[in-house]
């Protein structure tokens, strides 16, 4: 291994024909539990350049709020993440489960209902990297979940998994946008899939549905107005806007999307099944948690990014 999330391929296995290897790699991804898998080539086409320019405009406008890591230069130059990268395997984990929280429960975004997806996806991507080691000698790879400085939605779009919608989420025609994205960068040269094309059409349901008007125009989300940002990332003692019942994240712009209303598929993956307390706990119950209870309830959860004092802050806003 090169580092904690990279690998070098020194297997003496027979080199496969690139097209066969690409198909086999994507099949392996599906067998690991990913709902979608596709491959993009590096250097990329005009679309990645367009998405990079859009990111630069977004940053220049200050829409990242205080998320300084969004300015990491590696996000705009994939070669800095893995020198010599030629291909990107993009994968998507379907996290939608056809269950609902009780009306009395503080609202928690669905991505946080199950186990920490960073760990789940990283483990599965590493297995794919090790499998790739066995197939092609002398290649290098790096696994990336959304904590890596990568334009994950742009590369997933380039690999054909879906298109970036007007709410900023990647939308798949087969699954909607209830998807978590991961990538395996590799120096192996693999044939690319056809990039996805947008199917949003004239629909703009997500824009007026946002309770804080965070989607300032199609495809532009201002984090300074976003409930998800303020509940998860804002470290101030008070949040500057109403949370509208949300204590962790926000799913409104996804809930109103027709692609989710008509194409969401309930996942049976054990990693994304909801914890019982998420579905049924009340504001008063959550507000009474000690730090130890918080640690127990959120063990191996992506919601641990919301510290205990932030959790109480968010709950206090709900009254």
UniProtKB/Swiss-Prot annotation:
Residues that bind [4Fe-4S] cluster 2: 210, 226, 250, 253
Protein's cellular compartments: Cytoplasm
GO MF, one annotated term: metal ion binding
Any Pfam family matching the protein: Fer4_16
Gene Ontology terms: biological process: queuosine biosynthetic process; tRNA modification
Catalytic reactions of this protein: epoxyqueuosine(34) in tRNA + AH2 = queuosine(34) in tRNA + A + H2O
Cofactor annotation: cob(II)alamin; [4Fe-4S] cluster
GO cellular component, one term: cytoplasm
Keyword annotations from UniProtKB, A to Z: 4Fe-4S, Cytoplasm, Iron, Iron-sulfur, Metal-binding, Oxidoreductase, Queuosine biosynthesis, tRNA processing
Binding site for [4Fe-4S] cluster 1: 200, 203, 206, 257
Pathway in which the depicted protein is active: tRNA modification; tRNA-queuosine biosynthesis
Catalytic residues (positions): 146
Residue ranges annotated for the 4Fe-4S ferredoxin-type domain, each copy included: 188-220
EC number: 1.17.99.6
Organism domain of life: Bacteria
Cofactor note: Binds 2 [4Fe-4S] clusters per monomer.
Function recorded in the entry: Catalyzes the conversion of epoxyqueuosine (oQ) to queuosine (Q), which is a hypermodified base found in the wobble positions of tRNA(Asp), tRNA(Asn), tRNA(His) and tRNA(Tyr).
PANTHER family, sorted: EPOXYQUEUOSINE REDUCTASE
Complex formation: Monomer.
Protein family per UniProt: Belongs to the QueG family.
Name listed for the protein in its UniProt record: Epoxyqueuosine reductase
Organism lineage: Bacteria, Bacillati, Cyanobacteriota, Cyanophyceae, Synechococcales
Gene responsible for this protein: queG
